[in-house]
């Protein structure tokens, strides 16, 4: 199995196949998700001291904070081959 890394900004990467969702941090449920992950010691802060612009959810229930826009990370996931079925992702966006 080939491991593909996804650049989430500022020299940080995650394994692309482990990513479940990339969401915006603006809504109240996402703020709650972030706080719950912090309490459970499953929060990874990859913002490098910058403002959180995306929240990445992994299959191991870890929450990763990124300083890069969610749309940018999603585009990188598509162009770097991290998603096996592009049509499935496009359907999820609609």
Swiss-Prot record:
It comes from the Bacteria. InterPro entries: RemA-like (IPR007169). Belongs to the RemA family. This is Putative regulatory protein Sfum_3631. It comes from Syntrophobacter fumaroxidans (strain DSM 10017 / MPOB).
């Amino acid at each position: 199995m080939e491991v593909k890394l996804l650049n989430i900004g500022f020299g940080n990467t995650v394994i692309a196949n482990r990513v479940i969702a990339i969401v915006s941090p603006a809504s109240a449920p996402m703020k709650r998700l972030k706080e719950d992950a912090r309490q459970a010691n499953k929060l990874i802060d990859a913002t490098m001291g910058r403002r959180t612009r995306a929240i990445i959810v992994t299959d191991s229930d870890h929450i990763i904070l990124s300083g890069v826009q969610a749309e940018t990370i999603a585009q990188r996931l598509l162009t770097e081959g991290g998603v096996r079925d592009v049509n499935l992702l496009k359907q999820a966006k609609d």
